[in-house]
Amino acid sequence: MAEQTFIMIKPDGVQRGLVGEIISRFEKKGFYLKGLKFVNVERAFAEKHYADLSAKPFFSGLVDYIISGPVVAMIWEGKNVVTTGRKIIGATNPAQSEPGTIRGDFAIDIGRNVIHGSDAVESANKEIALWFPEGAANWESSLHSWIYE
């Protein structure tokens, strides 16, 4: 199986109409969309997703933010998709994100940074299992041989 990552467009990204732009950037890179959900997140689910941050002082505000509106949860697949996906997204703090990255182009405040992306293969697997217990769609693009050797 090729490497997969979990990407979530946060409520601010949805409200600002950035869903198509964000999906386009991953598709143009050559990654495959293998799962997509447009959902309103329940508090308990958000707390489970961000459980590793539960001791941080910003945890409560982060959970409130994630449940404030719908999110787009996605599985993306491709060679080095976790590392490359993080580069496409940019630094967690938009002030440190390069122009050309999603956060560098569309975010200003760390508390409204548009998008979440798995930081490692292990966390991607955990997040995908949480958000997509049914698994990813089973398909391969007809463009595969034009993108990968």
From Swiss-Prot:
GO MF terms, alphabetically ordered: ATP binding; metal ion binding; nucleoside diphosphate kinase activity
> What Enzyme Commission number does this protein have?
2.7.4.6
Kindly indicate whether the keyword Zinc belongs to this entry.
no
Catalytic reactions of this protein: a 2'-deoxyribonucleoside 5'-diphosphate + ATP = a 2'-deoxyribonucleoside 5'-triphosphate + ADP; a ribonucleoside 5'-diphosphate + ATP = a ribonucleoside 5'-triphosphate + ADP
Cofactor(s) essential for the protein? Mg(2+)
- Which Pfam families does the record match to this protein? NDK (PF00334)
> So where's the catalytic machinery, residue-wise?
116
Listed A to Z, the keywords are:
ATP-binding, Kinase, Magnesium, Metal-binding, Nucleotide metabolism, Nucleotide-binding, Phosphoprotein, Phytochrome signaling pathway, Transferase
Q: Which InterPro entries does its entry note?
A: NDK-like_dom, NDK-like_dom_sf, Nucleoside_diP_kinase, Nucleoside_diP_kinase_AS
The positions annotated for binding ATP are: 10, 58, 86, 92, 103, 113
| Broadest EC class assigned to this enzyme | transferase
Q: In its UniProt record, which GO terms are filed under biological process? A: CTP biosynthetic process; GTP biosynthetic process; red, far-red light phototransduction; UTP biosynthetic process
This chain's function reads: Major role in the synthesis of nucleoside triphosphates other than ATP. The ATP gamma phosphate is transferred to the NDP beta phosphate via a ping-pong mechanism, using a phosphorylated active-site intermediate. This NDK is microtubule-associated.
The UniProt entry's sequence similarity note says: Belongs to the NDK family.
User: HAMAP family, per this entry?
Assistant: NDP_kinase
Q: List the protein's name.
A: Nucleoside diphosphate kinase 1
> Gene name?
NDPK1
